[in-house]
Curated annotation (Swiss-Prot):
Family designation: Belongs to the SRP1/TIP1 family.
Gene Ontology cellular-component terms listed: cell periphery; chromatin; extracellular region; fungal-type cell wall; membrane; PTW/PP1 phosphatase complex
Record keyword Flavoprotein present: no
InterPro entries: Hyphal-reg_cell_wall_N, MCPsignal_dom, T_SNARE_dom
Location in or out of the cell: Secreted
Its job: Secreted protein that may be involved in cell wall organization and biosynthesis.
Signal peptide start-end: 1-23
Species for this entry: Saccharomyces cerevisiae (strain ATCC 204508 / S288c) (Baker's yeast)
Residues carrying sugar: N28, N35, N468, N664
Disrupted gene: phenotype observed: Decreases haze protective activity in white wine.
Claim: Ion transport is one of the keywords in the record: no
Name assigned to this protein: Secreted protein CSS1
Lineage top rank: taxon: Eukaryota
Disordered: annotated segments: 98-276
Length: 995
């Protein structure tokens, strides 16, 4: 008896010391009072093989006993905190652990396992074949060999154990002295501990057995088992699939005398308790900032508005109300549902795996847009991820930027309407469905929409749905075999050549917009194109063509081409281009059959894309919604259209057309009816086109069927009202930077009589300008003169001449363009230019030049001979050698039928001296002609001739040349004598040659 008392006192001291230590460490611990007077024991196992507990026995004088005990089930491997077990972590400090593979647990831990090898410091452990136990710790394991520090022993056949001993065995039948008992057949136990085993049917609160005189024993224990059916306690509970339960809240049970033992629950972000739910056990917990209290509710909320999730697996239905921050992995298991209610911010910075359902909901009528951020390692969806907050008063911001983004389920975001929600995401792999409503999507997850490498692109083998004005801006490469469905939205491709394998399907009205950055080698398949749903290029379109055989529509912009496989059955003559606005910049819309898109929904350009169209290629189709062409001066901004009738329409619109018959003629007119609502409550505009000839009618009323005209006889218009209309001309403007095509729209002239007035027109000529830097081609566009009579007036024209300019640096070709003279008679000859080629030679060599001069104006019907030039080649020789030059002179003006130009005579002279012989050429002007057929011209220059002089001395013979001036030739006879003299000189030269 004395020994038992000593053992009891030792156990009591150890318990009190443990309580003091726990109280100092877990400063936020609180206590929950209990009326039970018992020790606290928890012990269970799925197979009822081992039960462990560090229990002290009480007597009549026992006052305080602390027992920090927890128990886990067959699949539990580790727990973080002194609450229920988990299957994913290892814990220290007041933690119970039980698993088939548990090897080590430290500090105040109860352990049970078939392979437990080592446990230290106040650990209760049990097994069927314990061989040696020492100190106040019970140990069990099939191979347990040694445990130190006050341990009591138990075995499979123990029937009675006394003192501070905990016992557990598969066949345990009787345990005495404040010991908790559990076995495979346990049916009923009471006390402040939750307990369960494989066949447990009912367990309630604080389980322990104590002597009749025991006064106070308290303990808080969490317990789990593989087949728990019903458990209630102020403790979190988990089953075989539990991954973790943690919280900084403390749970405690105290006796009437004030003794308590608390098991704080803590995590790294100490604030909230959360449990992973099993079928019928507690599925959600309500927690406060500092303490966790167990309730059997189905929601988890926080008093300060923030819920911190630890590593959690959700296996049932769980609702989290308020802001949620998860810094560890969260898994929504298949068949489970996690509802995030009324939070304005959600952050998942670790893995988020949705195999069941994750719902973002609002219960209030008004609320701000949600900020939802996923930035962990993996975002994996095989179930459903759904967010519904279309009534948000500010923009919803969703950011999906994990390292790996994989969706094979369904992600659906219906975001704020008042200001389009924004979605940013990193490259993804999608084999399921993305559905977006009221959203602006920026792929690439970077601001500024920077292009990504091809290896960093997305893969879409599923569907992407764009509805209610959603715009998907694609910067990163997208490959795969998926589809993008434009229900009522826009798809904006910055790099169309990297958008491969995808099919764009128009299921409503919207816009497929393409930046002219790169030619797409393969046509983009487009299904459902009608013209109401449009294709736009965000730069000037210089050409548009359609191949009826292949069904490919090709738009050309400069040297780039963008092709779309829209299918066969279209008429190439019915395509046109209209200018408008998309994403805050000018765009050119590819229209078909005069139909203009009506629902390219607009949005603020700061956050996404806006679309509207103005201008036209034919007669100016009218405007509806935020996409249309101007007519009657109508203009579109956002979703407001106006016409010259002063009517205006706001909001989304539908297009109606009407044909008016009057005065034996049929005309289609353009009208806008303001604030007209159809049977479905939609505001609409009735629009058609009017030609520039301005057919007129009086519109008295409009309804859903069209516009109506009041007439006196039912067929004739009672009153006419002229409307403004517009013509559009395409002008190509060229400068040093290249050529750009612009569209000029002018107002048609007012009708002043029955005669149709000719509209203004433009004349375009191409001019090639050359300078030292090269040649550039420019296009000059001028307005044609207004018609003043029925006589056709020739418009201004330009004459272009090519001039080759040569200097010492070489020859360059220039083009000179001048304005032709105005027409003053029926036929007016324009100015012309005469071009002569001149070869100029100097000491540096010869250069060819071209001289262009203007022809004289005509003064009569007689053709005037233009000025001409005579070119002769002159070889100049001196001591340095001979150079050939070309002399060009202007021919005399013609005063009679024939005018003989001046001529030149050239003679070759060989000069010899002591240094040798040099050949020179002397050119002189020929004598005047004195015959009747020639007009005497200016006196010719003096003519020189050369003769040979032979000198002989003792050194040999030398040849010298003496040059003499001869009188002017007065007849052809003199010229003959000169010729003979030159012949003689040549002969003497031959005779003088040394033999």
């Amino acid at each position: 008896m004395f020994n038992r008392l000593n053992k009891f006192q030792a156990a009591l001291a150890l318990a009190l010391y443990s309580q003091s230590a726990l109280g100092q460490y877990y400063s936020n611990s609180t206590s929950i009072s209990s009326n039970s007077s018992s020790t606290s024991v928890v012990s269970s196992s799925s197979g009822s093989v081992s039960i462990s507990s560090s229990i002290a026995e009480t007597s009549s004088s026992a006052t305080d006993i602390l027992s920090s005990i927890t128990q886990s089930a067959s699949s539990t491997s580790g727990v973080s905190s002194s609450v229920g077990p988990s299957s994913s972590s290892v814990v220290s400090s007041s933690v119970s652990q039980s698993s088939s593979s548990v090897s080590d647990v430290s500090s105040s831990v109860s352990q049970s396992s078939s392979s437990a090898s080592d446990v230290s410091s106040s650990v209760s452990q049990s097994a069927s074949s314990t061989s040696d136990v020492s100190s106040s710790v019970s140990q069990s394991s099939s191979s347990a060999s040694d445990v130190s520090s006050s341990v009591s022993q138990s075995s499979s056949s123990a029937s009675d154990v006394s003192s501070s001993v905990s016992q557990s065995a598969s066949s345990a039948s009787d345990v005495s002295s404040s010991v908790s008992q559990s076995a495979s057949s346990t049916s009923d136990v009471s006390s402040s501990v939750s307990q369960s085993s494989s066949s447990a049917s009912d367990v309630s609160s604080s389980v322990s057995q104590s002597s009749s005189s025991a006064s106070d024993v308290s303990s808080s224990v969490s317990q789990s088992a593989s087949s728990t059916s019903d458990v209630s306690s102020s403790v979190s509970q988990s089953a075989s699939s539990t991954s973790g339960v943690s919280s900084s809240g403390s749970q405690s049970v105290s006796s009437a005398s004030g003794s308590s033992s608390s098991f704080p629950q803590s995590t790294s972000s100490a604030s909230t308790a959360s449990g992973s739910a099993t079928s019928n056990s507690l599925s959600s917990i309500t927690s406060s900032a500092s303490s966790a209290s167990a309730t059997a509710s189905n929601s988890l909320s926080s008093s300060d508005g923030t819920i911190y999730l630890p590593t959690t697996t959700i296996s049932g239905d769980l609702t989290l109300t308020g802001k949620v921050i998860a810094t560890e992995g969260v898994v929504v298991a298949a068949g489970a549902k996690l509802t995030l209610l009324d939070g304005d911010k959600y952050s998942f910075s670790a893995d988020l795996k949705v195999y069941g359902d994750l719902l973002v909901k609002k219960s209030k009528e008004t609320y701000p847009g949600t900020e939802f951020d996923i930035s962990g390692e993996n975002f994996d969806v095989t179930g459903n991820f759904n967010a519904e907050e279309s009534a948000a008063t500010s923009a919803s911001i969703y950011s999906f930027t994990p390292s790996s983004f994989d969706n094979s389920g369904d992600i659906s975001l219906s975001l704020s309407k008042s200001k389009k929600g924004e979605v940013t995401f990193s490259p993804y792999s999608n084999s399921g469905a993305f559905s977006f409503s009221n959203a602006i999507l920026n792929g690439g997850s970077v601001s500024g929409l920077q292009r990504r490498d091809d290896t960093e692109g997305s893969v879409n083998n599923g569907e992407i749905n764009l509805d209610n004005g959603s715009t998907y801006v694609i910067v990163e490469p997208v490959s795969g075999k998926g589809t993008v469905n434009i229900i009522s939205g826009n798809l904006y491709l910055h790099y169309p050549d990297t958008f491969t394998g995808q099919t764009v399907v128009f299921k409503g009205e919207g816009v497929l917009a393409v930046d002219p950055t790169e030619t797409n080698a393969t046509p983009i398949p487009v299904v459902g194109y009608t013209g109401k749903n449009q294709i736009a290029i965000t730069a000037d379109i210089t050409a548009l063509s359609y191949d009826g055989t292949t069904g490919v529509l090709t738009a050309t912009q400069g040297n780039r081409q963008f092709s779309f496989a829209i299918g066969t059955g279209f008429s190439s003559s019915d395509f046109s281009v209209s200018e408008g606005i998309f994403a805050g910049a000018y765009a050119y819309y590819l229209n078909y059959n005069g139909v203009v898109a009506t629902s390219a929904a607009s949005s603020s350009t700061a956050s996404g894309a806006s679309a509207s169209v103005t201008g036209s290629t034919s007669f100016g189709a009218s405007v509806t919604g935020s996409t249309a062409s101007t007519s009657f001066g109508a203009s579109v901004t956002g979703s407001t259209a106006s016409t010259s009738f002063g009517a205006s329409v706001t909001g989304s619109t539908s297009v109606y057309t009407t044909t008016l018959d009057y005065v034996n003629a049929t005309s289609t007119v353009v009208v806008s009816c303001s604030e007209t609502t159809d049977s479905n409550g939609n505001v609409y505009t009735i629009t058609t086109t009017v030609p520039c000839s301005s057919t007129t009618a009086t519109i008295t009323s409009c309804d859903e069927t069209g516009c109506h005209v009041s007439t006196s006889t039912g067929a004739v218009v009672t009153e006419t009202v002229s409307s403004k209309s517009y013509t559009t001309a395409t002008v190509t403007h060229c400068d040093d930077n290249g050529c750009n095509t612009k569209t000029v729209t002018s107002e048609c002239s007012k009708e002043t009589s029955a005669t149709t007035a000719s509209p203004k027109s433009y004349t375009t000529v191409t001019v090639t300008h050359c300078d030292d830097n090269g040649c550039n081609t420019k296009t000059v566009t001028s307005e044609a003169p207004e018609a003043t009579t029925t006589t056709t007036v020739s418009s201004q024209s330009y004459t272009t001449a090519t001039v080759t300019h040569c200097d010492d640096n070489g020859c360059k070709t220039k083009t000179v363009t001048s304005e032709a003279p105005e027409a003053t008679t029926t036929t007016v000859s324009p100015k012309t230019y005469t071009t002569a080629t001149v070869t100029q030679c100097d000491d540096n060599g010869c250069s060819t030049k071209t001289v262009t001069s203007e022809c004289p104006e005509e003064t009569s019907a007689t053709t005037t001979s233009p000025k001409s030039y005579t070119t002769v080649t002159v070889t100049h020789c001196d001591d340095n050698g001979c150079n050939t030059k070309t002399v060009t002179s202007e021919a005399p003006e013609a005063t009679t039928t024939t005018v003989s130009p001046k001529t030149y005579t050239t003679a070759t002279v060989t000069q010899c001296d002591d240094n040798g012989c040099s050949t020179k050429t002397v050119t002189s002007e020929a004598p005047k002609e004195t015959s009747e057929t020639s007009e005497t011209s200016a006196a010719p220059k003096d003519i020189h001739y050369c003769h040979w002089l032979l000198n002989g001395d003792d050194n040999g013979c030398n040849v010298k040349i003496i040059t003499s001036k001869i009188p002017e030739a007065t007849s052809t006879v003199t010229q003959l004598v000169l010729l003979q003299s030159h012949t003689l000189l040549s002969l003497l030269r031959v005779l003088k040659q040394p033999h």
